[in-house]
Curated annotation (Swiss-Prot):
Species annotation: Rous sarcoma virus subgroup C (strain Prague)
Locus of motif Nuclear/nucleolar localization signal: 524-527
DNA-binding stretch(es), residue numbering of this chain: 1502-1550
A GO molecular-function descriptor: RNA-directed DNA polymerase activity
Biased composition (Basic and acidic residues): 128-141
UniProt keywords, alphabetically: Aspartyl protease, Capsid protein, DNA integration, DNA recombination, DNA-binding, DNA-directed DNA polymerase, Endonuclease, Hydrolase, Magnesium, Metal-binding, Multifunctional enzyme, Nuclease, Nucleotidyltransferase, Protease, Repeat, RNA-binding, RNA-directed DNA polymerase, Transferase, Viral genome integration, Viral nucleoprotein, Virion, Virus entry into host cell, Zinc, Zinc-finger
Function, in words: Capsid protein p27: Self-associates to form the irregular polyhedron core composed of hexamers and pentamers, that encapsulates the genomic RNA-nucleocapsid complex. Assembles as a tube in vitro. Binds to inositol hexakisphosphate (IP6), which allows the assembly of the polyhedral capsid.
Domain Peptidase A2: 609-690
Protein name as it appears in the record: Gag-Pol polyprotein
A cellular component annotation (GO) from this entry: viral nucleocapsid
Free-text domain note: Capsid protein p27: Proton-driven dimerization of the C-terminus facilitates capsid assembly.
Residues holding Mg(2+) 1: 815, 890-891
Binding residues annotated for Mg(2+) 2, in chain numbering: 1158, 1192, 1213, 1272
Amino acid sequence: MEAVIKVISSACKTYCGKTSPSKKEIGAMLSLLQKEGLLMSPSDLYSPGSWDPITAALSQRAMILGKSGELKTWGLVLGALKAAREEQVTSEQAKFWLGLGGGRVSPPGPECIEKPATERRIDKGEEVGETTVQRDAKMAPEETATPKTVGTSCYHCGTAIGCNCATASAPPPPYVGSGLYPSLAGVGEQQGQGGDTPPGAEQSRAEPGHAGQAPGPALTDWARVREELASTGPPVVAMPVVIKTEGPAWTPLEPKLITRLADTVRTKGLRSPITMAEVEALMSSPLLPHDVTNLMRVILGPAPYALWMDAWGVQLQTVIAAATRDPRHPANGQGRGERTNLNRLKGLADGMVGNPQGQAALLRPGELVAITASALQAFREVARLAEPAGPWADIMQGPSESFVDFANRLIKAVEGSDLPPSARAPVIIDCFRQKSQPDIQQLIRTAPSTLTTPGEIIKYVLDRQKTAPLTDQGIAAAMSSAIQPLIMAVVNRERDGQTGSGGRARGLCYTCGSPGHYQAQCPKKRKSGNSRERCQLCNGMGHNAKQCRKRDGNQGQRPGKGLSSGPWPGPEPPAVSLAMTMEHKDRPLVRVILTNTGSHPVKQRSVYITALLDSGADITIISEEDWPTDWPVMEAANPQIHGIGGGIPMRKSRDMIELGVINRDGSLERPLLLFPAVAMVRGSILGRDCLQGLGLRLTNLIGRATVLTVALHLAIPLKWKPDHTPVWIDQWPLPEGKLVALTQLVEKELQLGHIEPSLSCWNTPVFVIRKASGSYRLLHDLRAVNAKLVPFGAVQQGAPVLSALPRGWPLMVLDLKDCFFSIPLAEQDREAFAFTLPSVNNQAPARRFQWKVLPQGMTCSPTICQLVVGQVLEPLRLKHPSLCMLHYMDDLLLAASSHDGLEAAGEEVISTLERAGFTISPDKVQREPGVQYLGYKLGSTYVAPVGLVAEPRIATLWDVQKLVGSLQWLRPALGIPPRLMGPFYEQLRGSDPNEAREWNLDMKMAWREIVRLSTTAALERWDPALPLEGAVARCEQGAIGVLGQGLSTHPRPCLWLFSTQPTKAFTAWLEVLTLLITKLRASAVRTFGKEVDILLLPACFREDLPLPEGILLALKGFAGKIRSSDTPSIFDIARPLHVSLKVRVTDHPVPGPTVFTDASSSTHKGVVVWREGPRWEIKEIADLGASVQQLEARAVAMALLLWPTTPTNVVTDSAFVAKMLLKMGQEGVPSTAAAFILEDALSQRSAMAAVLHVRSHSEVPGFFTEGNDVADSQATFQAYPLREAKDLHTALHIGPRALSKACNISMQQAREVVQTCPHCNSAPALEAGVNPRGLGPLQIWQTDFTLEPRMAPRSWLAVTVDTASSAIVVTQHGRVTSVAVQHHWATAIAVLGRPKAIKTDNGSCFTSKSTREWLARWGIAHTTGIPGNSQGQAMVERANRLLKDRIRVLAEGDGFMKRIPTSKQGELLAKAMYALNHFERGENTKTPIQKHWRPTVLTEGPPVKIRIETGEWEKGWNVLVWGRGYAAVKNRDTDKVIWVPSRKVKPDITQKDEVTKKDEASPLFAGISDWIPWEDEQEGLQGETASNKQERPGEDTLAANES
């Protein structure tokens, strides 16, 4: 980038002169363009294709952010790039057109007239033969050195005027200033015939309105034209001829028009409005292509002409495209004839080349119009490119320059710039706001938002400038002009003896007190000294106003001294007499009389006060000291006045007050009626409402309105999502104490003007929290509103680096008080931030308010705050470019080169912010020494963070996260090395924020060192006079870098940088340092605005020359100095390490032993084999907890450590390990377990290692295949017995299939091992012996609730089934509660009896405390099944289905298709219970009630064996019950009864082998159905499926397994 900056800077100095931008500005612009993705690399700026997108993007950015610095720089750079490019193109095209370059192309001669394609080949640069110009170029030097003087004779034959040669058609190439090109010397002899009229044109020309040939055509006087033009410079001329609309007739133009145009171009330039007007006038009628080209040859130089030809061709292509789309386009002749094409429009078609007569005869009128219009548009573009205008960004309104002149210069520059047309109007308006005088800027800021064009802005400013300026003299002049007609009307009426309401109303006479006349006309001449007389000036007794001798503090003069008082009455009208001195040093004070017009009694009906004329105040304010105490006041709608000493409470007069201004002669001005404000101010103020009543219209105001916080034009509208429908969330109730606090806070915000009453359809809750001080804080829950907003993008990517402040510059820190509450919300967005102030018990309608300012908690508030404050400060940044101003949120830091400059700038910044409506806390203004900003303490030479706590409190993962975040903020300032951050990074592992963490010893030791570092280390402020240096080094657990000055001698660090955490399994140190160098260079440009001057590299790079490729890529474009030296002492705290560039691993075989490695996931072994003579040596390593990749890595590491000092070849079939080992050719940072294993092994070797990868199980014979097979067979060999298989599963919990393959056991054995594991079963099986159902009635019940909508409103049915007899009891309930459960069980006990145990799910109604106490009272055991698994209650679930099906059938039979009436529900439920309990089910011969009350005594069946957990078959058991998939067996010795899966039961026939299969034993069990009591029962329950047979944990091992 540095090289590109140098090239661009040099070009700017060449073509821009004094206005060229600095290298810093160019670098900042290039960085911005790369950051925004507009440039892939800085060198792309040379490509013209990127110029327009860059211009559009920077223009858009300037309009949005109001910052035009980069756009200004780009404008200068673009002008320089275009000038350089045009200069190069011009030199090449000039040679091309004149035949001076490598080509041999020249304008066509007469011999080309009959070859239409010739000129096309000329445009393409083809060689067409030797022409006139080429022959002239071969002249001798003495012939070409002296141009031939242009005379009045024929250029062709030398005869006098009137020869036929004057009409020869030889289109000349005349250029302005052609004497610069020697090859043009003498060309006039060959090209002087350029009258542009073909032979015979005189005879074929027809006059308008006549048919046939004209007998005497009017021709152009060519001799006169040549004489005229010869005196102005061009030696050769082509005369354009106008085509009239009446027909193909040519009307010659006045030669002086061409002469004047050529002279105008030479003197005024192409961009001159005069030039443009003359060209447009000359081309107002359609011209032929021949005439257009010759005209441009006359007025344009060689380079502009070449540019014009290209631009003309582009414009003609546009016409052709339009004509192609529209067959009836005028250029197509309204669809008659062939369509137009480029050859026709350029005059290159057959019969047109060099033949103006043919062009006039063949071209259509529509084509002529298109040709001329395209030529004129191309001329405009060439004028803009050939003579680029000055940069518009430098244009500022001068102190004495009028706004119109400034607007003229600005618009001309912008229109001539390269800005897109759509961006010009916004740029002009933005320049009006920033580049004009302050008073004009203020006028534009107060303009309505509907003014969107430059013309509207200009008209608005001119209209407002018609009034007098706001000065003392301006006020006097304005008031004099306003009152003068009033005085004249009064004088005329007095002279005529008339009175009426049309003039000024007469006040009271100050002599007699009577109305209708004034003191001068009073018939009663009172004597002086009368004690009853009151003075109207001093309010004293005993004298009148003329006799008043009271002196003010104005050197003994009364107010109004110095203003003339004309005679009254008299022949002349009186002059304006005001009670104020119109001087800048005096305050404009007036005497005022206030009269209360109310009807209630008061002590004083009128009072006299002195008030200040303040055109900056919106309203009239009477001081509390001047306001009579018995005059009533009331609360105002806006209870605060802002702008007069801050926020001041205000009240308003309840009665209408008549206000009159007393003139110097004692006369009273026209009284006004108003309701003034009353406030505690130092003096009364007459605002604009009073001044306008006096006839003054003050519109060009300076400063903001006094009753606003921040002008509304600074409000930034919010962006809403497309579905931003109003959100209404009810206000939740608040306790009385918090409600009182909320009411007080709302009233306070209302008085401050932050909120306003609302009727919005939006609502979100508000609440209060108690602060540590005991007071309350108002909070607004805006989460629902934020969800509807489109968040603004970040406008500040991070906090500024404070060490970049110039060393020794004094500092000042400002704090904006309540910044959010000083910025208004856009009016259309306020309703979305409404809230409700509730009342207790709804005693009154709730009061609703909405925010007028930025509310805290809105997602866009911080961004808007930054944008608004930045917009206010932007003019100051432009005005004081040398001032360093840091702005972060509501904190400002100013730095200047001197204390005086800092104080002056600080005062200006404060006044600017206060005028904008912000408040600066005086106690928050910091000056040196001891300045603190953004958590740092700044001195004149250093920047240090504020001290850390002694030892933080760490209890959870979230505490560690917050601590690490704080340390990351301090690392760039303290240089905390990676080794001190390691213990804290270790504690960040985990995903639960509440996971427990402890403050361990490693963290404590690291923290102590960090605290000690914070007391001794600090950043040094940057000295711009010294070179900026950068250094990088490898250290423990990472790499570290620093930007500073004097790093190798007396280190002064300015910024620390660190390598990032590795993202790959292994990262070489060379790559780590490469990334750090790139980061260091980018940080230098971003922070200090410049590239590093000196870069210090580790000493290893000095020994390894040339530099590695990665380092060279990181140094691309670096123009500073590179030094390689030992590690600077500044890195001692990081414990630097040496960087080795030695290659440790290669992929080519090396001389040495060859070893083979392999690992197996089935055996969890890694092996290394190598051949020793005829025998293979083997080493193994086993780890049941390691992955196969780790086993492969450990096997390779074991092979590497066999011969550490001997080159070794390692052959592996693991592509993963082979690729990783090759990447570890140089030292680096591992980040995975496998990488750590390999890095540890490589670090212990001193010899080269080669890693060779082979494919496993390949058929290729040879040594490598043999060795790999040996390693593979050793890794996979294992013979696990059953006990070892169980141990393997206990360690790894692998599945049965993997266990069978790994241990070489059967699938059946593997499943049994897995089923015995309590952790691997989704439904863990309980020990054998827990009965899943009762062997007799009242042993085990199952209870559940089921929903039956037909039984609404009491639609919940509690169902209990006896697991032995299948008897069902059902009760109906409205809700599922503990009371309902207890009522149901009590009913079931009353019907069936008390059970020993009840089994349910784990619902809250079954597990509540009251239910447990109820069961304990009845002595009933209670068990629960799997949470949320209804299939654990198999019998009751089937009973639910049977019950609901029976209810449906009975209801439909009674005609109730949907809901059962409440009156019928009890009867129908009883019917269902009766049908289920008292009738046989299916093929059963007994009913459930019979089974329940008359149970069958179980008899023991044949002897059986059962399979226990060890896999052995145990004898001594007899069958009691045999069901579908399960069996109950009884031990013959202990009488213990247990339930086991049927597949674990087989007959106890000793003569059979123990491996008798199940199908062999089935005939034995086929005949036992006579004594199995459960068989009928199972069929009666409609048959169990495999899923329905699964019971709760603890019931049946079979059920758990089959699930």
